[in-house]
């Protein structure tokens, strides 16, 4: 499991940060010149260098956190220093402005990793990132359930695994896991994820916080069998993980025949209680099976032993079948009569003793999540930053090439900013589109980084990111307003290949258009085609239709027919001119809508509304579209495809105008699993399906359920809706009127920038002065530092020292922000 790379790491790791010249009362970081630093490099030693000119005052907050990390990292054999450039220095690092915001981890003269200093936001993040980089073979980062199963299968019959979920890289929990991996990486395979969906897939009920599982794969010999899992229920701290892993190493069940008060096991040493299942020879095998069941359910919480009554002189009450011994000294053994194994489990859980040292460790858990990347998009972008993208498939524009390109060729332009997380996430989808269109499209895919060319973006009225615009010669640019996904953008591009509107020349061509035969070669063609019918004399109405169609370009195919024989189509589809024909080729339906407006916006709205289905399946993508009508949702929850009876009933009432004051729709729980959570919130449990509800989101928040004892028919549904309007039915729940707000308040970056010059750093420097002599000693005797792995107890001492010396005053504003 261990690689030779880690053996090199055990020889010693040096961490040298290229940082700005910074002075405090006591600087625990060795300050080196580039020449001094490079002359001390040794094979197998790792170093991270940041060069800058003397006098630079940037990154002071980062340096304070780095000084906090010096001693813990030294205990792992990792030394920390900073290097200051001089003006005549010729090193390539000294001349890079970007270097001021990075820390570089080297081994010898080989670069291992670059760390932007903004991800090393505190001492936990520094230690977590450094150990994560060095333990890349011991800790596998996974993102999918398939990855987890693959590792699990490879370990069956060989070794066990420790699997952890943390909210983000660099958190205190991530640090704790990496510290555990440093010690136990030779004994177990570690796997780590930040994907909450993966945690949900393995059956975790509570997913609000970090989790750690022990996978018992060594016992599994059948590859089709899953490894048994044990969840660590304590918070993820270094001490708790150490205790948990130690209990996983202990025997599952021990047999003893001595006084329970005299028994000593690793559980007592770790502060955990002991449970004795009292047995006798006549029932020993059955009692052993019971004890094993209890042991599995109390694994990590208590030690379980089988106590033989027949072979000892201890006076055990005749009817007692369980003995319970607390971890505290001088507490007598408790003899109990518990005739149900569940009672044994609950008794242990209700009498768990929490050691004071755990409370001390727990201080790391009390602070708010201000240091956590609460933006999932930003977190994903950071994790994927090393994945190469074939950017050469799109043309990068500059101030010099932008106008020439968009004026001489049909172009799609992505306006983005490299500092903007959503932009960088969408860039992946944009490149995926380029891959799919390679060699098959006449439209040029381009991109421009607004972080570099802000003037161009401002002139193109780009005020938010990302923005996609289509430029065609002689036409105004068209902005893309769809989902930031490959499929939707591809559809937008392909539909824009078609004229808007399409001029239909004959009745036969019009019929082909309505059947979807004119553009069937487009894989992403729209599900609805619109044909405007006008007499030759309706010039103004035709112009309105053309303008309205241009507003919807890229989302719908529009056509226009205005020949002398247009009355044939008008009569066939029973409509008066001017009119719209809405064709849904996949469903074989053609509907007619009369046009009686003289405003472009009104006609565009008619076109947009006409695209909506009468009884749609609600998805994450289309829900906002239907919510804008501000009408109660008549919502049918289905476990799969909708029952034709329900569809026919609803559509019949729609045609009869009986549901005009509602938005009828349905939700497929297989396609949109979040529907299960919605139903549980409404009913308190998952009710039988299908379920027909009326949800009044916009006024009152009442949720009504159609009676399960009745069949859904036109008559019963209309009667039920009338009862609701008359106030004769009671809601099953009432939704809260509270606003949907972000989980955390927005960062006040100006105040955060001012803070280092006022309170927090000053207090940290004062606290650090208390350790001045210790740090001086550490710097004077670098050779005395052991580079081998520490014993767990030593590792825990480091963690506790770090917690005990954390400035208490700096935590108070954090608590206030969390309350906000």
From Swiss-Prot:
Domain Thioredoxin residue range list: 394-496
Keywords: Disulfide bond, Endoplasmic reticulum, Glycoprotein, Secreted, Signal
Span of the annotated motif Mediates endoplasmic reticulum retention: 817-820
Residues making up the signal peptide according to the UniProt record: 1-24
Top-rank taxon, per record: Eukaryota
Tagged with keyword Cell membrane: no
Positions of disulphide bridges: 450-457
Protein location: Secreted; Endoplasmic reticulum lumen
GO CC aspect terms: endoplasmic reticulum lumen; extracellular region
Xref: InterPro entries: Thioredoxin-like_sf (IPR036249), Thioredoxin_domain (IPR013766), TXNDC16 (IPR040090)
SUPFAM superfamilies: Thioredoxin-like
UniProt KW Signal keyword: yes
One Pfam family per UniProt: Thioredoxin
PTM field: Glycosylated.
Glycosylation sites: 461
Domain characteristics, as noted in the entry: Contains a masked and non-functional KDEL endoplasmic reticulum retrieval motif.
The name this protein goes by in its record: Thioredoxin domain-containing protein 16
Species, as recorded: Mus musculus
Lineage: Eukaryota, Metazoa, Chordata, Craniata, Vertebrata
């Amino acid at each position: 499991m261990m690689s030779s790379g880690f053996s090199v790491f055990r020889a010693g790791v040096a961490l040298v940060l290229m940082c700005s010249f910074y002075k405090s009362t006591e600087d625990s970081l060795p300050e080196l010149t580039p020449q001094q630093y490079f002359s001390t490099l040794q094979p197998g030693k790792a170093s991270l260098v940041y060069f800058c000119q003397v006098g630079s005052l940037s990154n002071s907050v980062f340096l304070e956190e780095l000084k906090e990390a010096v001693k813990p990292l030294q205990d792992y054999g990792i030394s920390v220093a900073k290097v200051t450039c001089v003006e005549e220095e010729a090193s390539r690092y000294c001349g890079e402005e970007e270097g001021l915001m990075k820390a570089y981890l080297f081994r010898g003269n080989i670069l291992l990793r670059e760390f932007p200093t903004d991800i090393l936001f505190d001492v936990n993040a520094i230690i977590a990132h450094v150990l994560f980089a060095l333990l890349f073979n011991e800790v596998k980062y996974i993102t999918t359930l398939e990855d987890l199963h693959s590792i699990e299968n490879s370990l069956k019959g060989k070794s066990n695994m420790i699997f952890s979920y943390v909210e983000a890289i660099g958190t205190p929990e991530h640090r704790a896991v990496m510290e555990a991996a440093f010690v136990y990486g030779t004994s177990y395979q570690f796997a780590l994820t930040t994907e909450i969906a993966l945690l949900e897939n393995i059956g975790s009920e509570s997913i609000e916080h970090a989790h750690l599982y022990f996978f018992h794969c060594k016992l599994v010999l059948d590859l089709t069998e899953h490894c048994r899992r044990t969840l660590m229920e304590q918070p993820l701290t270094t001490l708790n993980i150490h205790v948990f892993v130690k209990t996983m190493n202990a025997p599952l069940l021990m047999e003893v025949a001595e006084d329970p008060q005299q028994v000593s096991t690793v559980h007592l040493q770790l502060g955990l209680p002991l449970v004795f299942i009292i047995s006798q020879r006549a029932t020993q095998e059955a009692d052993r099976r019971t004890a094993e069941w209890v042991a599995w359910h109390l694994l990590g919480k208590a030690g379980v032993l089988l106590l033989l009554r027949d072979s000892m002189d201890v006076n055990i009450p005749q009817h007692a079948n369980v003995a319970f011994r607390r971890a505290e000294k001088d507490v007598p053994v408790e003899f109990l009569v518990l005739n149900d194994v569940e009672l044994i489990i609950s008794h242990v859980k209700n009498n768990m003793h929490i050691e004071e040292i755990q409370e001390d460790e727990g201080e790391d858990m009390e602070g708010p999540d201000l240091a956590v990347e609460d933006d999932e998009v930003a977190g994903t972008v950071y994790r994927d930053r090393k994945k190469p993208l074939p950017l050469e498939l799109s043309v990068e524009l500059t101030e010099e090439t932008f106008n020439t390109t968009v004026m001489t060729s049909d172009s799609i332009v992505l306006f983005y900013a490299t500092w903007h997380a959503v932009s960088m996430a969408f860039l992946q989808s944009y490149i995926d589109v380029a891959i799919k269109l390679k060699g098959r499209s006449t439209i040029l895919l381009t991109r421009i980084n607004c972080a570099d060319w802000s003037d161009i973006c401002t002139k193109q009225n780009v005020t938010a990111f990302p923005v996609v615009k289509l430029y065609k010669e002689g036409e105004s640019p068209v902005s893309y307003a769809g989902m930031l996904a490959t499929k939707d953008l591809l559809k937008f591009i392909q539909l824009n290949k078609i004229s808007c509107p399409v001029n239909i020349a004959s009745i036969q061509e019009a019929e082909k258009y309505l059947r979807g035969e004119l553009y069937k070669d487009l894989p992403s063609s729209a599900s609805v085609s619109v044909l405007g019918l006008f007499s030759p004399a309706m010039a103004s109405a035709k112009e309105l239709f053309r303008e309205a169609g241009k507003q919807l370009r890229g989302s719908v195919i529009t056509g226009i027919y205005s020949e002398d024989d247009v009355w044939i189509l008008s009569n066939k589809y029973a409509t008066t001119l001017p009119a719209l024909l809405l064709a849904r080729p996949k469903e074989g339906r053609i509907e007619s809508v009369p046009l009686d407006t003289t405003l472009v916006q009104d006609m565009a709205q008619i076109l947009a509304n006409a695209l909506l289905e009468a009884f749609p399946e609600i998805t994450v993508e289309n829900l906002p579209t239907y919510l804008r009508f501000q009408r109660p949702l008549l919502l049918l929850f289905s476990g799969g495809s909708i029952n034709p009876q329900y569809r026919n009933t609803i559509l019949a009432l729609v045609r009869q105008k009986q549901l005009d004051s509602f938005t009828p729709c349905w939700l497929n729980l297989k396609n949109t699993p979040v529907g299960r959570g919605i139903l549980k919130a409404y009913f308190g449990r998952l009710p039988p399906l299908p379920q027909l509800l009326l949800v009044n989101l916009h006024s009152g928040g009442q949720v009504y359920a159609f009676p399960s004892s009745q069949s859904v028919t036109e008559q019963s549904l209309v009667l039920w809706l009338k009862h609701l309007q008359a106030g004769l039915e009671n809601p099953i729940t009432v939704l809260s009127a509270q606003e949907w707000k972000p989980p955390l308040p927005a960062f006040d970056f100006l105040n955060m920038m001012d803070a280092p010059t006022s309170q927090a750093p000053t207090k940290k420097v004062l606290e650090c002065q208390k350790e001045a002599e210790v740090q001086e000693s550490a710097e004077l005797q670098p050779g005395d530092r052991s580079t081998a792995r520490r014993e767990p107890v030593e590792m825990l001492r480091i963690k506790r020292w770090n917690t005990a010396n954390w400035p208490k005053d700096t935590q108070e504003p954090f608590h206030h922000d969390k309350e906000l």
